[in-house]
Amino acid sequence: VDSTQLESSSFTVNLTNHNFQFSADAISYSDSATSEFAGSDVNSHNYHSLATTSQFLPELAIIYEDQDILAINKPAGIVTHPSGSHYSDSLSNQVASYFRSKGEPTKVRSIGRLDKETSGILLFARNQTAAARLQNQREEGISEKTYLAAVSGFMPVDEDGAFHRISVPLAPDPDNRLKMVVSTDGTLPGSKHAETLYSVLKSTGPDVAAPASLVMLRLKTGRTHQIRVHMASLGHPLLGDSLYCLSDISNPFSRAALHAWKLKFQLPFSIDEAASDTRASMHHDKNAKKEISLEAPLPEDFKKFYETIF
């Protein structure tokens, strides 16, 4: 890949029968929406007393916003919700501060969550109705989130863009409360069905010193560490993953190499609903009930990985 291309706001991965565009300002609309994702409940928190954030946190990277939703490109290394030692420096605290700066209520409703080490798109609802409708889209398979992962080992490229299915239950690791494990027969305590789709976009040759692959993934269920555990179960753990990647595997990442790359969903209000609310109609008169496609530009570690490895 041309280095000048990587330094621009977008770059393309060209493969046989593939043309993957990584764009910093990719927002597009269409009339239909199809997907396969069943997720967890809306995470709703009121951070009125916590609507201040550390001056050391990066500025919010807003991908898209209107009166009902806010889409953020979350950096790696920031937790989604406050807890323990991250009481006031979570992404939700930042969002609460942003809402307050706009004169809005500081109740934060995230549609799903991302692990601390995971970068990429995270969606927030600005009101209860939007939150409920967006969550329903996840549960009914209308919305679709696509991830990119850099994994250890050579994997044959799927030149035809085909997806492979991993359908193996996951359960809490009985020996390590921080980890999840595969529960092949589903008998471990806390076992839950988990299903992941993946397609290999690019791979090194199998004979290089430290083979690696770039994989695109979609979730049909939303379990803790699902992508990390499923890929590790195939013998291809995420590079940089201190929980599931063997220490002797060479990796260029200082965190688990996972990026929430793309998100497709429907705007939560219809044209008629928007028209009845002048606040909403300012934003939804053309795009209501349309599918919106968002893309989070790749972080520097992914760009460097691609440029160096491929």
Cite the ranges covered by each PLM segment.
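RNA pseudouridine synthases
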Residues: 1-310
